[in-house]
From Swiss-Prot:
ATP binds at G164, G165, A166, G167, V168, G169, K170, T171. The lineage of its organism: Bacteria, Bacillati, Actinomycetota, Actinomycetes, Mycobacteriales. Its main location: membrane. It is found in: Cell membrane. It catalyses: ATP + H2O + 4 H(+)(in) = ADP + phosphate + 5 H(+)(out). This is ATP synthase subunit beta. It comes from the Bacteria. One of its GO terms (molecular function) is ATP hydrolysis activity. It is a peripheral membrane protein. Produces ATP from ADP in the presence of a proton gradient across the membrane. The catalytic sites are hosted primarily by the beta subunits. PROSITE patterns: ATPASE_ALPHA_BETA (PS00152). SUPFAM superfamilies: C-terminal domain of alpha and beta subunits of F1 ATP synthase, N-terminal domain of alpha and beta subunits of F1 ATP synthase, P-loop containing nucleoside triphosphate hydrolases. The keyword Metal-binding does not apply.
Length: 478
């Protein structure tokens, strides 16, 4: 396969000196070394099939040798093969041409080969916006998902982390957010699939096509079957496309990264292959630097923004692991998906007591929103504290006040669940968008005890209070 990079050469060429898996040492003529991060290309014949492999310069070793990381499997690559310098870093297509299409980390279109090669391309290695260009205003991003809008509100132009172990709903929540942003705001989204399953990528593409939101989304994939160099760079490729929409087309953009842990994991693999001494728990010593270079580019500039939603796999549900811990430092809001809540059949399985947002304060969200959120959290916290007593002595031993608190907490817990648009075909129930003011009013009324007479099952996975009342009427008719 010929890549866009293979067609742009500087005339500088060298020879492969050593191949160790995805790491390739290349010898160049004296005084003619390519710059760090430059893309190199080498032609390979494997079983009578010609292909071009792209390498990225990672180190200058001395003696006119550079060490590069391959962006494709190195099968068929031999010592002595000619390597050409493109004279610039890996670049990807930008602009409206990328919408509705799938790309790899090198900017090659996978669903329509050749697309975007003739248009504008940007290097994936870019500097973050200057300090005087940053937006100082803080604004809430309304999602229509009750538990998020009320208890862990997202910042427009902020960075949001979705934490959780395997199988608790991170990818489903990301798909739902893409759908909602396209439907409610007609916004542009960029999805970067970092080291996840190829099946999930295919499912996402087909679902988005089916739901009519694909034309507003660019997809960039570097999946788990690809070399670590690709998985380390694909997030930067997606971010570069998003930066163009923000800086040139002046749009508000949503950047989805699934999964940011795989970015750290790929960096660890590359670091080991390059011979660096590992740091804590075997991670690369440059983990904080690499994460910072990516995260500092995700920000709001004057009048426009990139809001990033990042799924974070937590290895063995251990939040002290260096990879998720490093991500924490950059986030404006964290949404923790909890296996114990998912086991109750409540989706999204957001843990309201451990999820956080830096903007949940009266000066930003308003006094009423803040007070209702605090009342909800206090009721849920009190319920959690009473669980040990209930487990040992039963509900009958609680005071009347505590009994009311526990019953309200159960209703709140179930009402925090919600039907998703992307889950309609699985649940058979239509998705729901609940405006923020309706969410605040609904939880205020539940906390006030207006719905204490309603059975708990009336609150399961519904939208607003209208749905609850309709469900209650159905039960009465039966």
């Amino acid at each position: 396969m010929t890549t866009a990079l293979s067609e742009q050469q500087t005339g500088l060429s060298g020879r492969v000196a050593r191949v160790i898996g995805p790491v390739v040492d290349v010898e160049f003529p004296r005084g003619e070394l390519p710059a760090l991060f430059n893309a190199l290309t080498v032609d390979v014949d494997l079983e009578a099939v010609a292909k071009t492999i792209t390498l990225e310069v990672a180190q200058h070793l001395g003696d006119n040798i550079v060490r590069a990381v391959s962006m494709a499997p190195t099968d068929g690559l031999i010592r002595g093969a000619e390597v050409k310098d493109t004279g610039k870093p890996i670049s990807v297509p930008v602009g409206d041409t990328v919408k509705g299409h799938v790309f790899n980390a090198l900017g090659d279109c996978l669903d329509e080969p050749g697309l975007g090669r003739d248009g504008e391309q940007w290097s994936i290695h870019r500097k973050p916006p200057a300090f005087d260009q940053l937006e100082g205003k803080t604004e809430i991003l309304e999602t229509g998902i009750k538990v998020i809008d009320l208890l862990t509100p997202y910042v427009k132009g902020g960075k949001i982390g979705l934490f959780g172990g395997a199988g608790v709903g991170k990818t489903v929540l990301i798909q739902e957010m893409i759908t909602r942003i396209a439907r409610e705001f007609s916004g542009t989204s960029v999805f970067a699939g970092v080291g996840e399953r190829t099946r999930e990528g295919t499912d996402l593409f087909l679902e988005m096509e089916e739901m009519g939101v694909l034309q507003d989304t660019a997809l960039v994939f570097g999946q788990m079957d690809e070399p670590p160099g690709v998985r380390m760079r694909v997030a930067l490729s997606g971010l570069t496309m998003a930066e163009y929409f923000r800086d040139v087309q002046h749009q508000d953009v949503l950047l989805f990264i699934d999964n940011i842990f795989r970015f750290s994991q790929a960096g660890s693999e590359v670091s080991t292959l390059l011979g660096r001494m590992p740091s804590a728990v075997g991670y690369q010593p440059t983990l904080a630097d690499e994460m910072g270079e990516l995260q500092e580019r995700i920000t709001s500039t004057k009048g426009r923004s990139i809001t990033s939603l990042q799924a974070v796999y937590v290895p063995a549900d251990d939040y002290t692991d260096p990879a998720p811990a490093t991500v924490f430092a950059h986030l404006d809001a964290t949404t923790e998906l909890d296996r114990s809540i998912a086991s109750k059949g409540i989706y999204p399985a957001v843990n309201p007591l451990t999820s956080t947002s830096r903007i949940l304060e009266p000066g930003i969200v308003g006094e009423e929103h803040y007070q209702v959120a605090q009342r909800v959290i206090n009721i849920l916290q009190k319920n959690k504290e009473l669980q040990d007593i209930i487990a040992i002595l039963g509900m009958d031993e609680l005071s009347e006040e505590d009994k009311i608190t526990v019953q309200r907490a159960r209703r709140i817990e179930r009402f925090l669940g919600q039907n998703f648009f992307v889950a309609e075909k699985f649940t058979g129930l239509p998705g729901s968008y609940v405006p923020l003011k309706d969410t605040i009013d609904a939880f205020r009324r539940i906390c006030d005890g207006e719905y204490d007479a309603y059975p708990e099952r009336c609150f399961n996975g519904l939208g607003g209070l209208d749905d609850v009342e309709a469900e209650y009427k159905k039960l009465q008719e039966k």
